[in-house]
From Swiss-Prot:
Zn(2+) binds at C25, C38, C41. Belongs to the scaffold protein DUF35 family. PANTHER family: BLR3430 PROTEIN. InterPro entries: ChsH2_C, ChsH2_Znr, NA-bd_OB-fold, Thioester_dehydratase-like. Interacts with acetoacetyl-CoA thiolase and HMG-CoA synthase (HMGCS) that catalyzes the first and second step in the mevalonate pathway, respectively. This is DUF35 domain-containing scaffold protein. It comes from the Archaea.
Amino acid sequence: MGKPMQVSRYWRHFREKYRLIGGKCENGHLLFPKRPICPICGSRNIEEFQFSGKGKVITWTIVRNPPSGFEYYKPYPLALVQLEEGPVVLAQLTDVEPEEIKEGMEVEMVTRKIREFDEDGLILYGYKFRPIIKSE
């Protein structure tokens, strides 16, 4: 099994993982994750931008042979989610059965356990997406 991410590095990325903090360049291009240079226009003037956490499933698959450390979760759905604001995020889907997943399904970001390291007890949390349940 690979070594866990250093705790200090994990905490540096805390806001991105829990609140979907990305970037917005001076020309209005939205980026996730935040980058030092806008890949669209080359601007270096990037400010923080908080995404709503809502979006739609573009496409998805079921991971049946996961990477080391994620065997406990198999099989699990992995999706490309287009956020309301435009950027596309690759993330696990949660709180949904595979037969219920549809392209265009509205989802929202939630914080969930991503991985647990038995050797030192470190638990990593991050974002996943779940279906938005519409009340009638």
